[in-house]
């Protein structure tokens, strides 16, 4: 291994140890609390891996040291360092967790038995619809918010991702609609097209027994079919703010002056995406009196507080998640410490250990999303890309194929990290770490939803150490490391190398097509915000898409 590369990897090693030492020294003077924390469960994958391809015929010892990141002596040094710091780090971790465990045990002791939807006051027809969808008992956010909604209260709902909040606001609207059927009865606003379509599907499913009509209004789609759907006077409208405003201003005969229910879903995200001006204009044409409003959000920022004051009347706050960085207890988190240049090899090893499991891979850029999708398809994996520069039809097609299990790997930017209810995701892989801990929580929240178990694995390279330390700090605990033998990973080097060359050629063709204005497989006609990069502008394929 070259001195430069060795220094880089050694720097990575010392950075982790130094961070842990600083943390241990900082807390050494404070008395430690007693703890009965149980050891973390093993993160070793249990799925059997098919026979790997034959290893390369020739492999130098220098290449092996370079690949693995540490020589044998270095590995012993790392082990000794971890053992030296291990007792202190373990004690610190136990001290940190003791209060949390005590609170969790206290909460469990007083937790009431799970309630059915009938217990919450939901009518029999809608209970039957819930039963048909496999909803046996209500989730905590449903248990807390549905009775309040049925009592006519405005609600602010703060809940962790995957908590079942969509049904929490759809069921009360449908129940009120049964008592007083009316066109344009309810309006649900969502920040993204995908989330809007997902909510519409939930409305259709829960309202199928009572023949509810729902229209979906989102950008990137032809306005004419949407106007036709509005002319049929649907009971419920699910919309993104921008496209809803377009129809309010341009579609003849469409008015919401008799609206009874308004829902702002993912309100923090609505404001993050600069929908504030559109929302102000929409609120001006909505009735203020005789309207019930529900606001659901992952966080309660100052912007959301302002939105609450503008849209709600004497709301009741329902908070299920005590922290914006809380993850569900059924989620098993781990990380792999790997050299940056071998991320593809580690990924293939991980996916082979999870053959047949529904998996979402998260990347930072559109370019990397496309490259990984090509790489995986070349190696025989059923992978689809999902990012903001795909046309709307391609994005919906990718989501529907993944939901229907026609494809088992979705390679996505953070366009898919919030709000999407994709059932039965077994594994989330942070191929690229997100820039902040909140995005991390939303990403890993795609699995272990509604009480199911799931796993999230993060790739941490020598360039990601500081970011990962910040994520761990926000989570309030250390994420356990998942170790992989370099020999197990190295057997994929030859085949992965060939697939990488294929991906490079395809990506070059794609970029050439974009420069010539012909679009291409990655872009579609809908493109993304910011266009095609004409006039020497940076290609949007290389930009972060958070």
Curated annotation (Swiss-Prot):
CDD domains: DEADc_DDX47 (cd17954), SF2_C_DEAD (cd18787)
Feature: compositional bias, Gly residues: 519-530
Residue numbers spanned by region Disordered: 1-108, 504-546
Feature: compositional bias, Acidic residues: 60-77, 94-103
Cross-referenced Pfam families: DEAD, Helicase_C
Domain Helicase C-terminal: 342-490
Reactions listed under catalytic activity: ATP + H2O = ADP + phosphate + H(+)
Gene Ontology BP annotations: rRNA processing
EC number: 3.6.4.13
Keywords: ATP-binding, Helicase, Hydrolase, Nucleotide-binding, Nucleus, Ribosome biogenesis, RNA-binding, rRNA processing
Top EC category: hydrolase
Presence of the UniProt keyword Mitochondrion in the record: no
Biased composition (Basic and acidic residues): 504-515, 536-546
Intracellular or extracellular location(s): Nucleus
Molecular function GO labels: ATP binding; ATP hydrolysis activity; RNA binding; RNA helicase activity
Transmembrane segments: none
Domain notes: The Q motif is unique to and characteristic of the DEAD box family of RNA helicases and controls ATP binding and hydrolysis.
Record family assignment: Belongs to the DEAD box helicase family. DDX47/RRP3 subfamily.
Record text on subunit structure and interactions: Interacts with the SSU processome.
Protein name: ATP-dependent rRNA helicase RRP3
Gene that produces this protein: RRP3
